[in-house]
């Protein structure tokens, strides 16, 4: 019995502690990322943004948290109560579970699995289920139409993201996220794969329902989309899941194209900075790009969104996969692992 506890109990306890620490850190970072998003949007519109709760509004997200927690959860008449309440939980759990394989530094990862990129792709694909469950269970036409839009949108852009990932893994020669970062020591992949970087960034906006691709929650058409019937903690969980997913896509952009935790130049003093600092700086830089797109770019029409995904991104990404394979084989530079 003691041997079993030592063999399985201690490693499980360590993983549980690491997971708890990661979740707490993610929730804190998400609170301030949400505040930064609101501040950036306000600055673009020549406003101050949240500035009352705490110094410079730094405690605004926590005030919003308390406000949501103490409000009443209202379930619409005729709604499927079980699925209605399960939908936000599914969204949050899937968003958080994706971070289990994200390496913040060379050895700072909970599960350094060999198919990490495949795991992330699967988790991000499942995220649409929370939206569909919410739209169907609300027993209202606006959430239902929003769920249909979200399903079509996410499926459309998953295809392009898949081909982008194929280009990166062919160049790196591995599905392991740590190995992909290490393979960028000579050159970050956004330089040779610049078109794929642009496609991945724009597809990430569509995948996370960020403007200008927030068709699923377009206020002028669908009120608040699939969240229109939600209130209190359930609504807060949807917002939390959305921003954790955004941070996950920012982290994936950093790992696949921006060298992860690697410094821009491998000389002093750059290589003296801890890798996790470089990783977080790159993630926040990508999020800043997300926020600026939200502030400046108007929302696309639904037909424009579908046309961009199927008639522009899909052919370009497919062509780039063939081109990458041809270059690797033609110049005999296929990575050996």
From Swiss-Prot:
It is a multi-pass membrane protein. GO terms for biological process: aerobic respiration. InterPro entries: NADH_UbQ_OxRdtase_su1/FPO, NADH_UbQ_OxRdtase_su1_CS. GO terms for cellular component: plasma membrane. It catalyses: a quinone + NADH + 5 H(+)(in) = a quinol + NAD(+) + 4 H(+)(out). Belongs to the complex I subunit 1 family. NDH-1 shuttles electrons from NADH, via FMN and iron-sulfur (Fe-S) centers, to quinones in the respiratory chain. The immediate electron acceptor for the enzyme in this species is believed to be ubiquinone. Couples the redox reaction to proton translocation (for every two electrons transferred, four hydrogen ions are translocated across the cytoplasmic membrane), and thus conserves the redox energy in a proton gradient. This subunit may bind ubiquinone. This is NADH-quinone oxidoreductase subunit H. It comes from Parvibaculum lavamentivorans (strain DS-1 / DSM 13023 / NCIMB 13966).
